Amino acid sequence: MARPQNHRRSNWTERDDNDDYLFQRFLEESETRHSREPSPVTEQSQQELQQDVQQAIDGIFNSLRRNMSSTSNINRAANMDATTNGNGGINADTIRATNANTADSPFTARQQSPLRTFLRNLFILDYFIGLILFPFSVYNILRSGFNSMTFSENDFIIEIVGYWKFAKIFGSGGTTLIAYKDTGKLGLLGKFHNIIVFYSSPVIKHIMKSRDGNEPNLNWIRLMFAKAFELFVKVSTILIYLAYGVSGTVYMVTAGFFFVLCLLFTVIRRYKGVHRMLVSQRITGPGVF
């Protein structure tokens, strides 16, 4: 009986050893299987990476397709413009001609708002009124400038006309030259007259001396020289008077405008300085307002 029991014990021990061996083999195979099979997290990250790469490649191809299509459209449009350029001018000319020949009917014309029409007519009226009143304003400015420059109380046109009609160059005998006093009514015109007569008197002396000679045939020539000299003196006096008055008026207007402009700039700068001071005091200081 001892031998069968020993045989049974040996079988049991061998069976236990085989079970341990098989269990170890199972554990090893399961570990190797887990190491070989990728984890779901890594699989998901790899799938996302592949999707991103695929989207980037698709975007590159789409941009290339768009660029190719845009270049083809530009070339096609350039070819169409080159082919239709000659016909376009003819068609435009014909369209302009037809539009010029066809009158706008009240049914097809675009109706404007009454306020816009009223404002346009008002601006046109103001423009024409300005054109009409502009010469009068210029005349008033010149008149005030002449009066202030020439120290005259009368109108400069009236003074010029009076000088042209009543001023005389030669005396009653025709051998003397007339010079007007400072207390006369001609004013500054009389002074300019005296200056021109004084500086041109040597030229006319020969004519005045030889007027009573024994050459009757040359009397009419001397008379013509006298008339020309009288005309020269009057025209020169009036031109100098006008030049003096206009230049003085322009100078006064320019100086006044410059003075007003400087005063305006000064007031604006002072106002800005005061405004900055008030703003800074209101921001930094205690509440005043």
From Swiss-Prot:
Q: What protein does this entry describe?
A: Protein ASI2
| Subunit structure as annotated in this protein's UniProt entry | Component of the Asi complex, which contains ASI1, ASI2 and ASI3.
Keyword Nucleus on entry: yes
Q: Which organism is it from?
A: Saccharomyces cerevisiae (strain ATCC 204508 / S288c)
- Which parts of the chain does the record assign to the membrane side Perinuclear space? 244-247
- Spell out where the chain crosses the membrane: 223-243, 248-268
Q: What does the PTM comment state?
A: Not glycosylated.
Membrane topology, record value: Multi-pass membrane protein
